[in-house]
């Protein structure tokens, strides 16, 4: 039987009844109070005030939005979806909004704004407050901006990584090697992880891969894997999958590995700021937290990739290696071709289709995805001692060709909850070449933007099916790529943008 609401006459002057408003504010907790609310007046709360709410053993700090009219009663406090989840609230729960304690660590953020070096203790204090949700998005933006560019030195990068690890969960795999691989990113369709993990696991090495969802790309590895099998596994479930199969491909966010990183990324994305120190801390904090011992870094280099020059790649590679070694990781960095997308599909389901084609050894499998996966799998096998120096590629190729990789992938998917086929978009339309000539270049960033406008990764079936590669000759009117969308509106939106970006696939007209 549902508990009746508390009579208004029994409410104390500082208690408000909670309402779930169903407002999506992404990950930012937001509190809504009426302009005539007695607590607003007694506490001096104004719009954008930071307000602390406690319920049972949970406490959150939310940003206040003040409303008028009949949207909310003066004796009610409304919560966004993010705030509701964090507080673990039920309709009608009573709370007493209050001012949060001053955030002492903001002094360290101000110091960094003025160029001061931050100690381990200072960075730890900041990250603890970030993870506890005490920072508003404006305060998070100040920290991210203060650390942007090259403002974090190597010592601060190590300190940031350690603080981010300490703020979350850690997985302990006991004795033995734990292999891992990470791609720096910026290359659409580069879904090699889902081919590498079953190859490596089939050769007897452990590879429990915790992957991310898309941040600025049309698909992350977790998004793509989720079209084939469940990825929201807790630590106990991950351990069972790895004990049974030797590997997994799961979403790291489900097990709170380096939760501060997810919070900082939320603010970094709209600011579009690059920070080598934060990038290195983001990558390595999750590797340390995941219990990895050996980490292979795939670093695509190209004019429209995330890393645009060999010099920048060398600098980032050295920093990753030095920080990783300080944290007890064995590191290996491989620079790869970042000139064009990998495979044909861009978007979760389309990339999953390519992965399945490679693992099943189908004639339609994209050769570049297969070759790149085998090269990196070979590096991991040599790194872990499963193959002699120079013999990794041959072993990886044999495991893929004889079906062992496909069987292992099926085992992993079954252990994670079952293998399924990726969805297909209901709405598709091709974009054609405006002239005959050779494909000179493909702009990774523009192509990724078009795929996102089509609905990826939110709509798993959405994205782009690429039909041409650099160096190929195309005729006028030949399809360059096909847009996939879940709705006609998203398809039209993506087509409009694609039409305005004629050089996304740069065709050089023959003289």
UniProtKB/Swiss-Prot annotation:
One of its GO terms (cellular component) is cytosol. Keywords: Glycosyltransferase, Transferase. It catalyses: thymidine + phosphate = 2-deoxy-alpha-D-ribose 1-phosphate + thymine. One of its GO terms (molecular function) is 1,4-alpha-oligoglucan phosphorylase activity. GO terms for biological process: pyrimidine nucleobase metabolic process; pyrimidine nucleoside metabolic process. The keyword Transferase applies. Its EC number is 2.4.2.4. Coiled coil: none annotated. The keyword Hydrolase does not apply. PANTHER family: THYMIDINE PHOSPHORYLASE. Belongs to the thymidine/pyrimidine-nucleoside phosphorylase family. Type 2 subfamily. NCBIfam families: ARCH_P_rylase, PRK04350.1. This is Putative thymidine phosphorylase. It comes from Polaromonas sp. (strain JS666 / ATCC BAA-500).
């Amino acid at each position: 039987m549902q508990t009746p609401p508390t009579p208004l006459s029994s409410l104390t002057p500082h208690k408000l009844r909670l309402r779930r408003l169903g407002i999506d504010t992404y990950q930012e907790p937001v509190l809504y109070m009426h302009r005539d609310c007695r607590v607003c007046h007694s506490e001096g709360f104004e719009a954008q005030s930071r307000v602390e709410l406690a319920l049972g053993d949970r406490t959150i700090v939310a940003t206040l939005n003040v409303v008028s009219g009949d949207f909310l009663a003066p004796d009610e406090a409304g919560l966004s979806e993010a705030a509701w989840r964090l507080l673990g609230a039920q309709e009608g729960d009573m709370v007493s909004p209050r001012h949060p304690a001053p955030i002492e660590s903001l002094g360290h953020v101000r110091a960094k704004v003025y160029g001061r070096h931050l100690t381990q203790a200072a960075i730890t204090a900041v990250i603890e407050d970030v993870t506890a949700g005490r920072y508003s998005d404006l305060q998070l933006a100040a920290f991210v901006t203060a650390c942007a560019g090259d403002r974090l030195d190597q010592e601060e990068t190590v300190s940031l990584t350690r603080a981010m690890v300490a703020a979350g969960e850690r997985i302990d795999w006991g004795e033995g090697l734990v292999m891992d691989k990470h791609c720096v990113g910026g290359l659409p369709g580069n879904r090699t992880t889902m081919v590498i993990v079953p190859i490596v696991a089939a050769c007897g090495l452990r590879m429990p891969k915790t992957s991310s969802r898309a941040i600025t790309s049309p698909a992350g590895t977790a998004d793509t894997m989720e079209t084939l099998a469940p990825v929201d596994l807790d630590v106990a479930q991950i351990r069972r999958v790895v004990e049974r199969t030797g590997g997994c491909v799961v979403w790291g966010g489900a097990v709170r590995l380096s939760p501060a990183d997810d919070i900082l990324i939320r603010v970094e994305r709209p600011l579009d700021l690059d920070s080598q120190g934060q990038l290195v801390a983001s990558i390595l904090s999750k590797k340390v937290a995941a219990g990895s011992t050996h980490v292979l870094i795939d670093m695509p280099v190209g004019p429209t990739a995330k890393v645009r020059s060999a010099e920048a790649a060398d600098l980032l590679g050295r920093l990753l290696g030095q920080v990783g070694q300080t944290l007890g990781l064995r590191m290996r960095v491989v620079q790869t071709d970042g000139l064009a997308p990998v495979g044909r599909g861009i978007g979760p389901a389309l990339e999953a289709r390519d992965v399945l084609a490679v693992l099943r050894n189908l004639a339609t499998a994209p050769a570049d995805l297969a070759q790149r996966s085998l090269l990196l799998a070979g590096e991991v096998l040599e790194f872990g001692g499963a193959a002699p120096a120079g013999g990794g590629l041959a072993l990886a190729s044999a495991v893929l060709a004889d079906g062992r990789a496909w069987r292992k992938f099926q085992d992993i998917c079954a252990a994670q909850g079952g293998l399924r086929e990726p969805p297909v978009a209901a709405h598709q339309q091709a974009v054609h070449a405006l002239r005959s000539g050779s494909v000179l270049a493909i702009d990774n960033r523009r192509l990724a933007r078009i795929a996102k406008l089509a609905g990826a990764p939110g709509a798993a079936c959405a994205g782009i099916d690429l039909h041409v590669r650099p160096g190929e000759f195309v005729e006028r009117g030949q399809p360059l790529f096909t847009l996939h969308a879940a709705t006609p509106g998203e398809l039209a939106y993506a087509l409009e943008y694609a039409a305005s970006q004629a050089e996304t696939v740069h065709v050089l007209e023959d003289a």
